[in-house]
Every structure is written in structure tokens, then in C-alpha cells.
Amino acid sequence: MTRGAWMCRQYDDGLKIWLAAPRENEKPFIDSERAQKWRLSLASLLFFTVLLSDHLWFCAEAKLTRARDKEHQQQQRQQQQQQQQQRQRQQQQQQRRQQEPSWPALLASMGESSPAAQAHRLLSASSSPTLPPSPGDGGGGGGKGNRGKDDRGKALFLGNSAKPVWRLETCYPQGASSGQCFTVENADAVCARNWSRGAAGGDGQEVRSKHPTPLWNLSDFYLSFCNSYTLWELFSGLSSPNTLNCSLDVVLKEGGEMTTCRQCVEAYQDYDHHAQEKYEEFESVLHKYLQSEEYSVKSCPEDCKIVYKAWLCSQYFEVTQFNCRKTIPCKQYCLEVQTRCPFILPDNDEVIYGGLSSFICTGLYETFLTNDEPECCDVRREEKSNNPSKGTVEKSGSCHRTSLTVSSATRLCNSRLKLCVLVLILLHTVLTASAAQNTAGLSFGGINTLEENSTNEE
């Protein structure tokens, strides 16, 4: 009865019914809010699912492209190895033919003279010296060119030495003196030769009459690893390795001791060996930490290795190179390495950072370059030549690169996936916070209505 009276009084007082609405009317409003939240969450999940699938497909395509590139590179390496094996076989066959004891007699019976006799005849008939002139001149004399044309492929044994010196197929650097190129392996076999004194000796004819064996040229002997440096350049520029006196006057001294020459050549070989060790360490670091070979649009690991080798050899042998088509200051190779080699980040190999390079040149701008600075052959110019002529080293072809998108995708797939997961977590947090705020607002609204009802009742 009390309830009926209250309801009547509520109706008589003219109060609106929605102030004391039943709970059944609140349920559709709450259901619509929940449905809207579910729609937002499902839409966001669908969007990020599509985004993740797109990135996964992108990464899979990049991996397939990279696998194809690796197969192509392996095929190229196999072809290069086969070519090297064929060249080694040809060299071994040439060595076997020249090691036969009866080949001079056979040549004499066929009406041809031995290579030593031909070289001696050319030297006696030529009026130009066999030693290359000063670095400012272009090359050797005419007799040198004739000797390179006649004896190319024959003089593997130096004089009467029983130990052969390995002969290079092509001469490095470009524009070599005579076309005859040898690597320095045995210091005794090299120092036992009769070296040409060139224009320094005024009694050239007397020397030729006293020594029937041919005079060898220092510019025809190269180091094994730093194969762009000749003995002529080393004896001319680096005259004191390991506190030794290795000047040209000492080496070319007639009747001098062979001990000094051998010690100098062995010192140069030690420097060359240390440079090769440092290069192998750098190559192992590249192989270990460099994920993708296509790290740049303008450069590749082969370009980096070429300029790094040139810079490394220029640090061990600070001499000027003579037989080059174009020379640059040797210190400039440091900048080439800095710009062509990649940024190596051992701490995190998945994320690409911008900033300083892993190879930084120091001390280049402190001292100005003068004319006394040594100059080296420009390998940047030589590596661009696609058709190497005789007397040059055969360079590898251009780097096989894929597109920038594919090359960058192989390194950014994992980081993008992590970024998408992080965005999903943040979205879930935002939705949860908004839902909590809405529920709090509804509860506060209910409390306000109850308070209003209580005041109305009073």
C-alpha cells in the first residue's frame, strides 16, 4: 500500500517516469556499447592480420629472391674455380715441358736457339737499357718490348737455377715494362740473378761481354699478395725495411754479397705476409657479420675488398708506383674504404642504424698533401675496364645486385614483425583503458541517478 501511494504521489507530483526507469531499459544500451567495442577490436585485429600477412609474404618473396641470388653467385664461383683450375693445369703443363732436360737440344736441332741465347742476342743488339727509366718516363725501351714479345711464355727458369719462379699469366699493374711477370717466392733464386744496371752503368757493353747470361729486370718481379708492387719500386722507395740498407746501389752492386739482397727480399716478403693476414681477418669479419651482400646500391663486398687491399698494401709499402695508367695519393684509399665498405654492427645485426662508419679515417686533414706523398695506382679506374688487355690483371665482373626493396627486406623482416606485435599490444592497452573509462562513467552515472532519486523522495 505504501508503494501504491508512492507511485500515485509520484504521478500526482508530475515527475517524469524515466527518472525511476526499470533496469530492463538499460540492457539494450549496454549491449550496443559492447557490440561497438567488439566491432572496433575485430576491425583492428583484421587490419593488423592483413598487415602481418602482407609483411610475411614480402619476407618470403625476399628470401626466395636471395636464394636465387646465392645460387647464381655459387654458379659464378664454380665457373671461376674451373677457369682457375684450367689455368693451373696449363701452367703445370708448361712447367713440365720446360723441365725436360733435352728441350734446348731439341730447339737447336730444329734451327731455333735457346731462350737464354735469344735474350743474350737481343741484349747485345739493343742499345737501350733493360731497366725502366725514371718514374716520369712512360716505359722501357724498344729492346725490352721485343724481348717481351719473343720470350713470353718461355723463361720460367732464371738462368741456370734449378728452382723455378712462378710466372704470372698477366702483369699487374697496367702498362708493365716487358710483359714478363714473376712472383717473388724464393729470395735466393731471385738474388742469384744478374740484374740490369740500366743507364747507371757506363760500361754496359763490357758487362754484357763478361756475363753471357741474360740480365733480368727488377720491374718484372712482383710480390705474391700485394701484387701491384715490384722489386724496382720497393728498392727505390722503401730502402730501409727492418733497419736494413736496401738501396738500388747495394742490390745492383757487381760482385756484392748476396746476403744483403736476400735479407731485403725476405723483409719485403714478411711485410707482404702480414698484409695478407690482416686482409684475411677483415674478410672473415665481413663474412661473419654482414648479413646481406647487397648492402648498398653503389657498392658491394668485392669493391670493398679491392679498395681495402689497396689501402692495406699502401700502409705496409709507402712507395710510389711507377707503371700505372693513372695514379692517386695513397692516402685517398682510406676515404675509398670508408665510403665503399659497409657499416658492421656486431651488437645488433637486425636493425639498421644511421651514423658513423665502422672504418674511420683519421689524420687526413691534419697534414696537407704535398708532392712528396707517395702515389699509388688507381684501382677504381682499373676495375671498371670490362675488357682487360694483355699486361693487365683480370678483374672480376660487376657485382650482381637485386633491387633495393628486396635487399632491405631481408634485413628488416624481423624488425617489422616485432613492430607490428608492439602496435597490437598498444592497441589492446588503449581499448582496455577506454573500456574501463566507459564502465566507470556508467557507474558514476548510476550513482548520480540514485542520489537524485533520494533527494526527490525526500
From Swiss-Prot:
GO terms for biological process: calcium ion import across plasma membrane. Its main location: membrane. Component of the NALCN channel complex. NALCN complex consists of NALCN and auxiliary subunits, UNC79, UNC80 and NACL1. These auxiliary subunits are essential for the NALCN channel function. It comes from Homo sapiens. This is NALCN channel auxiliary factor 1. Glycans are attached at N217. GO terms for cellular component: plasma membrane. Residues 75-96 have a biased composition (Low complexity). The gene is NALF1. It is found in: Cell membrane. SUPFAM superfamilies: beta-sandwich domain of Sec23/24. Keywords: Cell membrane, Disulfide bond, Glycoprotein, Membrane, Transmembrane, Transmembrane helix. Auxillary component of the NALCN sodium channel complex, a channel that regulates the resting membrane potential and controls neuronal excitability.
